[in-house]
Amino acid sequence: MRTFIWSLLACWSMNALAEQPPSNDPAVIKAQLQDYYFEAARRGDLDMLTTFIDSGYSLNTQDDKGYTALILAAYHGQGPFVERLLNAGADACVQDKRGNTALMGAIFKGELKIAQRLLATDCNPDQRNGAGQTAAMYAGLFKRVELLDELKAKGADLNAEDPIGNSAARLASGEIRTPAPR
């Protein structure tokens, strides 16, 4: 009998929690909208994106890690979503809190078509992240040789070095420098 009563109370508690009215707090609403927006980017939900675009939502909104919907969509391989964001005016040059861009994320994940599309934007090909690395260095490290040629054609310096002395050219040849042990 006790088990039955506890089960009944547990069900009643969950029901009461599920029936709470939506919040009118602007901060809560803003956070919920951000969550929907970023989840749409991860999933590639174009209908949801269209709703955000049509409502005038800021396409370059960043989460607590500095990720934009474009960075998330590129990283998760959502090509049509990336294209729609760029056509609607999203900024491909925005960096997350570590300084990485959508292009760097696409290269890291091996999303070559997305990376090629991002290369067609007006971003500096030698833009550096917080560790001093460029998109070309990512392409070299992860053996995305076809992208190295495109980055070079766009003006990327394949001999530029990060603080450790790595360059895209060295990384592409398999030479990786690491920090000296302390």
Segments from the language model and where they lie:
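Ankyrin repeat A-helix N-terminal signature
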Residues: 39-44, 72-78, 105-111, 138-144, ...
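Alpha-helical adaptor scaffolds
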Residues: 67, 71-83, 87, 93-121
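Intrinsically disordered, low-complexity regulatory segments in ankyrin-centric signaling systems
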Residues: 18-55, 64-67
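Leucine-rich solenoid repeat scaffolds
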Residues: 140-182
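Ankyrin repeat structural motif
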Residues: 45-53, 78-86, 111-119, 144-152, ...
